[in-house]
Amino acid sequence: MTDPLVSIVTPSFNQAEFLAETITSVLNQSYPRIEYIIVDGSSNDGSVEIIKQYQDQIAWWVSEKDQGQTDAINKGFQQATGDIFAWLNSDDRYHPQAVSEAVQFFIENPDVGLVYGDVNLINHQGKGLGQFNAKETNYQKLRRGRVHIPQQAAFWRADLWKEVGPLDPAMFFAMDYDLWVRLAKISPIHYYAGHIWADFRIHGQSKTITADDKCWADMLQIHRRDGGSWFSILVAKYWIRKMIGPFWRWYKNRNYFDFIL
């Protein structure tokens, strides 16, 4: 694989406040061969006008009603023609070298199907909150709920998507975890330690804040689908989070507002 084309999909819905940062972080990559696709869910906050400002540099985009984030991502990858796939949400942003380093890794490691790096955590205004260091994982660890893969910093081979895709439309919160499990089941995956590839924005409307409990319910469903035991670590984590969930959400929200004040 020489100079592969990288297809990046951004699902967008009413996040105009962050969208230009997301778009420019893709367009300003040091790697030149990028096919950028944006799928907007009929936003009414000015997002479409922002997309139009960059449309000459976007391979394909659409703004129409959809069934949510998962549907938008699937729709985007239906249009993708690249050798390597990734998606970047409309409130996150890449670091300039991310795609180039991922491509080089794939060239040097033809047996690996998914590679991921680290991310910085940022707040609503883009101020740094710290760093999330991923960890090496595999199919068995993923099934036990040890995810450790930041979606913003993950890239995978397009030919594997053809085997395991699309994303499950029933998954609204843990569609990325579901994809990692399916990819890890058929291909080696690798953590590229020490390489920060993206900024993960934590804000009041992000799913990390608002829907952590729903994400774990999705993960439990995936675990059971793949034959997981009711006595596994993942199930224990699910029930612990369910019991302490109200306090945990209050604590996260309190700390989130401490960060932005």
Predicted regions and their residues:
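Short beta-strand/loop segment that forms part of the nucleotide-sugar
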Residues: 24, 33-42, 62-65
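Conserved donor NDP-sugar-binding/catalytic core segment of glycosyltransferases
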Residues: 93, 97-129
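Short aromatic/hydrophobic "clamp" motif used to bind/position activated sugar donors
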Residues: 85
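N-proximal low-complexity "stem/linker" segments adjacent to membrane-targeting elements
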Residues: 1-27
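Conserved nucleotide-sugar donor-binding catalytic segment
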Residues: 8, 132-222
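Glycine-rich, basic loop-to-helix element that forms the pyrophosphate-binding segment
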Residues: 64-80, 101
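Acidic helix N-cap motif at the loop->helix transition within catalytic regions
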Residues: 17-20, 45-53, 97
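A conserved acidic beta->alpha catalytic loop
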Residues: 32, 40-49, 89
